[in-house]
Amino acid sequence: MEFDTIAAISTALGEGAIAIVRVSGDDAVEKVDRIFKGKDLTEVPSHTIHYGHIVDLDTNQVIEEVMVSIMRAPRTFTRENIVEINCHGGLVSVNKVLQLILAQGVRLAEPGEFTKRAFLNGRIDLSQAEAVMDLIRAKTDRAMNVAINQMEGRLSKLIGLLRQEILETLAHVEVNIDYPEYDDVEEMTHNILIEKATHVRSEIEKILETSKQGKILREGIATAIIGRPNVGKSSLLNSLVQEKKAIVTDIAGTTRDVIEEYVNVRGVPLKLIDTAGIRETEDVVERIGVERSKEMMSQADLVLVVVNYSEALTNEDEDLFRAVQGKDFIVIVNKTDLPQAIDMERVTELAAGNRVITTSLIEEQGIDELEKAIADLFFEGTIDSADMTYVSNARHIGLLTQAGKTIGDAVEAIENGVPIDMVQIDLTRTWEILGEITGDTVHESLIDQLFSQFCLGK
């Protein structure tokens, strides 16, 4: 495939030590060489870096002191010639360098266009391309490992093996239908077809079994911290985040809005939501906060219910316990540094088998136990993201679910005595659906939509 030459700033905008302008295309080296004062870039070997200056051709003025990396096709990310200009960090100089490159007939890249070219030029498939964005957005080491595994093609390999198995089955069916007189070809009986289709369905189900953990690693666990005013919700947020994000006072009702913060808890990404204290109030602003707290509680994957060790349970406390029944929740009995007034037996009863953890956040006690409880709740204490392939992308999960249902329909049809040639439709459709994950059978409009979500310069 031949494309025009594109360029974009690949580093985050703002002040920094280094900013990089990336250029990709057949004539990328020649275009940059026009404004580069130093070695002749068209003559240097691939995968080398060179010192020089960027010059404004109209004024012959030196604009930047740079290091230029030359990478020639096909051993590059896009499989095109790539030039990366390492400038001093800062908005003015790097933008000036970009403008000088564009003035040489280079087009400004669209968001994700470099990765899109890597896909279109066959260097990576669609699932690997999507993993690039997952890596950029990873919030924990485990999420990073999952993204790297997918970038290396582990999911692609699994999908490829399944598609190959379906294709071989379809070919076998075709031969049996079109050339029944061939004695040297094994007959495709209903039993053999059921065995092959069932195996594919089983493998799809195995991949889908990792989707819950994969989705958590990719998107995080939406975790609502709820409780009456002044029981220590904001203190809990600050303890987990390990810095002061929420205002903590002895005045009930200090938190009037929802505060969100991501935190890494033993490799598990939590999207922590500190909510306004839930109570009856005449204050209009606080009442709005209370309603939002209830909404966040209903949407959360995990609820941390905070109660006060130094106070007896109230009707409002018991209402909160009833509201979270049916959800994953952990009870935090805070302020154990104060004299006990709470009925712990009643707390255990209301927890209904969920973990109850005592803490004194002011004395930094109980946080380690809480973090372990969270990790145990979602991963049973273990998750081997380095060796396992986790499916985490919602698009992939949807397609795998659809493929599993379609191949399941094929199995059911065979068991009901439907002629083998009619089952070909479901088998072919399963093969096509799985191909949408890797991009082998995907529509161009979907490709454009997916890559538009990438950042500029990637």
UniProtKB/Swiss-Prot annotation:
GO terms for cellular component: cytoplasm; cytosol. Its EC number is 3.6.-.-. GTP binds at residues 230-235, 249-255, 274-277. Residues 220-379 form the TrmE-type G domain. Its cofactor is K(+). One of its GO terms (biological process) is tRNA methylation. K(+) binds at residues 230, 249, 251, 254. (6S)-5-formyl-5,6,7,8-tetrahydrofolate binds at residues 22, 84, 123, 458. This is tRNA modification GTPase MnmE. It comes from Bacillus cereus (strain ATCC 14579 / DSM 31 / CCUG 7414 / JCM 2152 / NBRC 15305 / NCIMB 9373 / NCTC 2599 / NRRL B-3711). The gene is mnmE.
